[in-house]
Amino acid sequence: MASRLQRQLQLLSAHLVVALVALVVIGGATRVMQAGLACPDWPLCYGSFLPGRQMNLQVFLEWFHRLDAFVVGIGMLVLATTAVLQRQHLPRWLPWLSGACLVLVAFQGALGALTVTLLLPAAIVTAHLATALLLVMLVSVCHQLLEAGAVPIAAEAPARSSGGPERPAGGLVPGPGSGSRQTAPPWWPWLAGLATLLVAGQSLLGGLMATQWAASLCFSAGSGCAWLAAHRFAATPAALGVLLLAVLTAVSPGWCRQQRPLTATAALLVIGQIGLGVSSLRLQLSVPGVTIAHQLGAALLLAILAALTCRGWLARALTSGPQPMSAPAPTPRTVLSPSPAEVVHG
């Protein structure tokens, strides 16, 4: 039952990552299309669940953004409730992590309400984006932990009694085919974590620039250009961090080979982000699709980097955990040869 339930929650967490990335992108599209106040009330839109007569592109974006947020909230509630009710069959970290994500979803909903009722204040909109990106990373980590083969607490005693591997802190043991004899290089999780922090900071800086409408003001009136310059300056270390991680992973043997598909994807996303960022500036933000694609790339990049960081630390934890004690070797017995007297006297 435990493994089946865990596989179901793993699938649910994967769908939640996709839904959260879509939520970030739709929220960005809502801002780009200036549709943040297309629905003047909250949580309904024009007093109904589906505003048929008022429906246009802007209303649809805001309405669909709220619908996606509602779906994410329901999915997170199912994950957290199942983790608590079935905690004896699941890893002990899952109720805490899923509960924290559920609290963040509730906080995110409150921020969404404030963005409408307070008429889009920049600080609230930025906090709304920051919470969404944090949720993307946390749920991505949750999915990786579930995928890694976390075993229920009840399975710990049989594993120990049968001479199996003892479970390190956090309720994890290397599962079959998990490459338990290989581990991440010591530098790998640190570099992945640094790249994640740099990209997260760059994404927040981009969100601050967007909520201040700094790029538009810089192009039209020559004001607010400091935000634009800061965003361009911070893009360099973020891009170099991801590309360095991808290059070192490509040339490193062992465990790193399994991470090459994701690190290569992250590197391609960074290259695409550079192209989209340059294009949006050259087009002076006149093509909404380019800006929205830029936000999609940032959300996907954060989800992948969070997953890679989790994999790195998890691999280190699994191989550095307490090792099972082997049984002492039997003491060889000394066989004494019979003395001549014993031979004579029988």
Which residues does each predicted region cover?
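Polytopic transmembrane helical bundles with strong interfacial aromatic enrichment
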Residues: 1-161, 166-168, 172, 177-346
